[in-house]
């Protein structure tokens, strides 16, 4: 079974800087220029839809920085920003862990390592058993882009391939866990899982119990097109709490969601969208 690496960074600008959109581009630039974790460049450039890498937006005061309009975000010199990179690779990246002052096209930054976590995917099963009697709360830390077309029967997905239905701003349990399933399958090397993801999502919708939610849509800037126009998308933030009474199904959902708590869910995880946090709520706490 593969390993998941999660590295937390402190990122301090040494001058006033205008952050790029999305702000994850700062660390992405350092990887692609070979200055930080150069072995991850192949993962970044991969066209694989569910590739096992997540680069967070920069964070300030425990909130991720992302653009919701045309206004660029200016950060003052000396501000303590944070970032997380999570990935799975066969390469030994530990010798590549580095700190120091780095020049980027966005400014000069002092970068230090805050934390390093290495998780054996096989051992996620042990974590699953700890929470079988809990409700599951999925909290969206950054705007999350979930296409409901994931729940189309595979026989119809090709027919509606060109229909732009946007992203769900009120995602169902089935949609969330279907995306997590796809991330997990890619992580362990299982291919051609569209039919299974569809079935798993539909069954999870039918057999889940929603306890509560606080979800809201957010329009975010995800970059620029070839003409310099802003590319926008509508995603979701907030949280949803649910339970799955069927034990076998819940065990699977927990395993997939635990992997996604490192690698994110939805579109554009490689640039910071779809960051989630799992919270577990004792059933007796709910009235």
Swiss-Prot record:
NCBIfam families: cas_cas6 (TIGR01877)
Record's protein name: CRISPR-associated endoribonuclease Cas6 1
Protein's UniProt keywords contain Hydrolase: yes
Biological processes per GO annotation: defense response to virus
Residue stretches in coiled coil: none
Gene name per UniProt: cas6a
InterPro entries on file: Cas6_N_arch, CRISPR-assoc_Cas6_C, CRISPR-assoc_prot_Cas6
EC number(s) given by UniProt: 3.1.-.-
Note: The aCascade complex was purified from strain P1.
Species annotation: Saccharolobus solfataricus (strain ATCC 35092 / DSM 1617 / JCM 11322 / P2)
UniProt entry keywords in alphabetical sequence: Antiviral defense, Endonuclease, Hydrolase, Nuclease
EC top class named in words: hydrolase
GO molecular function, one term: endonuclease activity
């Amino acid at each position: 079974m593969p390993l998941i690496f999660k590295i937390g960074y402190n990122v301090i600008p040494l001058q006033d800087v205008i952050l790029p959109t999305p702000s994850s581009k700062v660390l992405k630039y350092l990887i692609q220029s070979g200055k930080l974790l150069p072995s991850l460049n192949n993962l970044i450039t991969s066209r694989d839809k569910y590739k096992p890498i997540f680069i967070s937006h920069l964070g300030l005061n425990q909130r991720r920085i992302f653009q919701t309009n045309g206004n660029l975000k200016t950060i003052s010199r000396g501000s303590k920003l944070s970032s997380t990179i999570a990935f799975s690779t066969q390469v030994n990246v530990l010798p590549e862990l580095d700190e120091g002052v780095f020049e980027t096209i966005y400014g000069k930054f002092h970068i230090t390592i805050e934390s390093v976590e290495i998780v054996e995917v096989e051992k996620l099963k042990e974590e699953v058993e700890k929470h079988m009697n809990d409700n599951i709360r999925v909290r969206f830390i950054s705007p999350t882009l979930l296409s409901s077309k994931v729940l189309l029967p595979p026989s119809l997905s090709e027919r509606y391939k060109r229909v732009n239905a946007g992203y769900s701003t009120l995602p169902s349990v089935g949609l969330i866990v279907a995306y997590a399933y796809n991330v997990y399958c890619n992580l362990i090397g299982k291919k051609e899982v569209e039919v299974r993801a569809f079935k798993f999502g539909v069954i999870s919708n039918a057999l889940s119990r929603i306890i509560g939610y606080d979800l809201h849509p957010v329009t975010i800037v995800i970059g620029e097109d070839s003409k310099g126009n802003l590319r926008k998308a509508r995603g979701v933030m907030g949280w949803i709490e649910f339970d799955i009474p069927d034990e076998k199904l819940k065990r699977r959902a927990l395993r997939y969601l635990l992997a996604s708590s490192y690698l994110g869910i939805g579109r554009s995880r490689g640039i910071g969208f779809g960051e989630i946090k799992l919270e577990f709520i004792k059933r007796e706490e709910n009235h």
